[in-house]
């Protein structure tokens, strides 16, 4: 009897230990293959004991709001939110840049529109407060059209596709696979610009990042470091096993493997027309933590210039009131830990 009680006690202790070891981290992403590495980290057990509670939330500003409210710890999203978070003091930090767009982002014009000049007075679809708006604004300015001369409508990708096909938007910015869907559905629609162009790829202006709440970084620093390592562990797995990795991502997002490969490619390498997925060492170079060179002419220590470009545009659009230094919105502590 005593042996049975002892065995029961050991089992209870082990169960308690297991429960404590499975520390939960709540994170979100929206439906896009570039964020799907979290599904690899979870399925392949690359999280160092973290239990990833992954939510798909299509509006990134909803995710940021949940982070500020303490209901999310981290999110993968586009890389322009740092200056807004710093200006509004919402308790969110950009931890690392994760990938530049290398052709997946496109500005598409409706049939019959062949120049930026024709967009004056027209509606263009973007995600306001997102990089799609900056990309559109840069292209308009470069082609002689001021942002005040068009009407921006704020739409997530699915809705932007509907707006273009339905004729309520004369132009829009899309990433894949949504851009190809529009081109297929609208004979005569044309691509006016994409993110393979030198000014966009060398600055890595269009790309993605990992954000964490300040409360998470400061209150659970070991978990923040583990989460960052988990992401890059998943990237390493995908680079070594792209076929299996893409299948896991497709399942997690409920995408076809073909749609995933349209963004990530099939061989774990840089995909022209898709994205360039940074490993942890490349991310460290871009974030200014280590010295080195990056492919495609991407600037080393490029996050500083990226911050300045996005800040300038957010001042123009009225999303921020102050031009703050990068250090107010970026915390590379978890990335430093992930390098060790």
State what each model feature region is.
Residues 7-15:
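Bacterial N-terminal signal peptides
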Residues 50, 94-95, 246-248, 322-324:
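Short, hydrophobic secondary-structure boundary micro-motifs
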Residues 80, 152-153, 159-163, 169-253, ...:
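Pocket-lining segment of extracytoplasmic ligand-binding domains
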